[in-house]
Amino acid sequence: MRARRGLLRLPRRSLLAALFFFSLSSSLLYFVYVAPGIVNTYLFMVQAQGILLRDNVRTIGAQVYEQVVRSAYAKRNSSLNDSDYPLDLNHSEAFPPTTTFLPEDFTYFANHPCPERLPSMKGPIDINMSEIAMDDIHELFSRDPAIKLGGHWKPADCVPRWKVAILIPFRNRHEHLPVLLRHLLPMLQRQRLQFAFYVIEQVGTQPFNRAMLFNVGFQEAMKDLDWDCLIFHDVDHIPESDRNYYGCGQMPRHFATKLDKYMYLLPYTEFFGGVSGLTVEQFRKINGFPNAFWGWGGEDDDLWNRVQNAGYSVSRPEGDTGKYKSIPHHHRGEVQFLGRYALLRKSKERQGLDGLNNLNYSANVTYDALYKNITVNLTPELAQVTEY
């Protein structure tokens, strides 16, 4: 009788345990879906730490190998006569470092191109992450008559090397935009770039489509001016160095390489998020961003694939120049896009079908003193993809 009761209790306990673990896993999956930003921050931190550990192991291995080689050559040289030349592992043919930024007394000429390494670019920026009203930002920059409607500015003392359109995807981040403008506008002025800000705001009930907003912003910006450089900039990323030059180059550029919330480590080699830059020619060649990524995640990885498929490589700033601070979020982020991995597996096949060439939209355009606001209601029907 007791044995029978024990047998009855065992399945019941197993069932309760199974229900408990099912409930726990369901709750975890739901949290990952509705709050992907928090979850992925921790995942990226762990991934970055793993990469750092791997690199440290490689460095230690190289140092051990060097010491072994040094010891071997030391023994060899001690047994040779004085006519032999010992190997000097400290010898280097590299030239001594030069000062790359111009001196304070540099003279500008109105008909000469602006240099890329100006004396006004000091390096570290004094970051102020406290919230500020947009009216206060307007008041702050209203003293500069050179800033035109829509945040358009160009230097008067030299010819700007790049005409830069700053594209900012936007939804419900009204407390972030003034903080970004407070830091970014003076930095771009110190870099002597011609620039304007485009805030592309998504309304409606569909999940956030960051990539499609960038495509819309590109199309609208090119109606204003023959821009030659595009900066795709998240609204919550604040650069920490004004030597992170927001011009473009022969290869696409990833600016935000070290983000504070990822412990200033690159989460993975193909990471292309936060702030990136391409020339207009490069952006058209890769067919822009994909339009099919609804919700959080995947579009930057697809952009990386597009860049590689087009024969480009990605350049990054050296050292700590690519450091950024992330403005804390006071609300829940966008939901996770669960279909991104299936799309990423077909990146190459989709590249010629999904992007600038299948984009349709209707925009409501208004002007702020410091940016052009482009409001769109995006739906999947506006960027349908044929079978591939």
From Swiss-Prot:
<comment type="similarity">
    <text>Belongs to the glycosyltransferase 7 family.</text>
</comment>
<dbReference type="GO" id="GO:0030311">
    <property type="term" value="P:poly-N-acetyllactosamine biosynthetic process"/>
</dbReference>
<feature type="binding site">
    <location>
        <begin position="329"/>
        <end position="330"/>
    </location>
    <ligand>
        <name>UDP-alpha-D-galactose</name>
    </ligand>
</feature>
<keyword id="KW-0746">Sphingolipid metabolism</keyword>
<feature type="binding site">
    <location>
        <position position="340"/>
    </location>
    <ligand>
        <name>N-acetyl-D-glucosamine</name>
    </ligand>
</feature>
<keyword id="KW-0464">Manganese</keyword>
<keyword id="KW-0325">Glycoprotein</keyword>
<dbReference type="InterPro" id="IPR027791">
    <property type="entry name" value="Galactosyl_T_C"/>
</dbReference>
<feature type="glycosylation site" description="N-linked (GlcNAc...) asparagine">
    <location>
        <position position="81"/>
    </location>
</feature>
<feature type="glycosylation site" description="N-linked (GlcNAc...) asparagine">
    <location>
        <position position="128"/>
    </location>
</feature>
<dbReference type="GO" id="GO:0046872">
    <property type="term" value="F:metal ion binding"/>
</dbReference>
<feature type="binding site">
    <location>
        <begin position="235"/>
        <end position="236"/>
    </location>
    <ligand>
        <name>UDP-alpha-D-galactose</name>
    </ligand>
</feature>
<feature type="binding site">
    <location>
        <begin position="298"/>
        <end position="301"/>
    </location>
    <ligand>
        <name>N-acetyl-D-glucosamine</name>
    </ligand>
</feature>
<feature type="glycosylation site" description="N-linked (GlcNAc...) asparagine">
    <location>
        <position position="364"/>
    </location>
</feature>
<dbReference type="GO" id="GO:0022010">
    <property type="term" value="P:central nervous system myelination"/>
</dbReference>
<feature type="binding site">
    <location>
        <begin position="208"/>
        <end position="210"/>
    </location>
    <ligand>
        <name>UDP-alpha-D-galactose</name>
    </ligand>
</feature>
<feature type="binding site">
    <location>
        <position position="296"/>
    </location>
    <ligand>
        <name>UDP-alpha-D-galactose</name>
    </ligand>
</feature>
<dbReference type="GO" id="GO:0003945">
    <property type="term" value="F:N-acetyllactosamine synthase activity"/>
</dbReference>
<dbReference type="Pfam" id="PF13733">
    <property type="entry name" value="Glyco_transf_7N"/>
</dbReference>
<keyword id="KW-0808">Transferase</keyword>
<feature type="binding site">
    <location>
        <position position="264"/>
    </location>
    <ligand>
        <name>UDP-alpha-D-galactose</name>
    </ligand>
</feature>
<dbReference type="GO" id="GO:0021955">
    <property type="term" value="P:central nervous system neuron axonogenesis"/>
</dbReference>
<dbReference type="GO" id="GO:0005975">
    <property type="term" value="P:carbohydrate metabolic process"/>
</dbReference>
<comment type="function">
    <text>Catalyzes the synthesis of lactosylceramide (LacCer) via the transfer of galactose from UDP-galactose to glucosylceramide (GlcCer). LacCer is the starting point in the biosynthesis of all gangliosides (membrane-bound glycosphingolipids) which play pivotal roles in the CNS including neuronal maturation and axonal and myelin formation. Plays a role in the glycosylation of BMPR1A and regulation of its protein stability. Essential for extraembryonic development during early embryogenesis.</text>
</comment>
<dbReference type="GO" id="GO:0042551">
    <property type="term" value="P:neuron maturation"/>
</dbReference>
<keyword id="KW-0328">Glycosyltransferase</keyword>
<keyword id="KW-0735">Signal-anchor</keyword>
<dbReference type="InterPro" id="IPR029044">
    <property type="entry name" value="Nucleotide-diphossugar_trans"/>
</dbReference>
<feature type="binding site">
    <location>
        <begin position="169"/>
        <end position="173"/>
    </location>
    <ligand>
        <name>UDP-alpha-D-galactose</name>
    </ligand>
</feature>
<keyword id="KW-0812">Transmembrane</keyword>
<keyword id="KW-1015">Disulfide bond</keyword>
<feature type="binding site">
    <location>
        <position position="236"/>
    </location>
    <ligand>
        <name>Mn(2+)</name>
    </ligand>
</feature>
<dbReference type="GO" id="GO:0032580">
    <property type="term" value="C:Golgi cisterna membrane"/>
</dbReference>
<feature type="glycosylation site" description="N-linked (GlcNAc...) asparagine">
    <location>
        <position position="373"/>
    </location>
</feature>
<comment type="pathway">
    <text>Sphingolipid metabolism.</text>
</comment>
<keyword id="KW-0444">Lipid biosynthesis</keyword>
<keyword id="KW-1133">Transmembrane helix</keyword>
<keyword id="KW-0479">Metal-binding</keyword>
<feature type="glycosylation site" description="N-linked (GlcNAc...) asparagine">
    <location>
        <position position="90"/>
    </location>
</feature>
<feature type="glycosylation site" description="N-linked (GlcNAc...) asparagine">
    <location>
        <position position="360"/>
    </location>
</feature>
<dbReference type="GO" id="GO:0006486">
    <property type="term" value="P:protein glycosylation"/>
</dbReference>
<feature type="glycosylation site" description="N-linked (GlcNAc...) asparagine">
    <location>
        <position position="77"/>
    </location>
</feature>
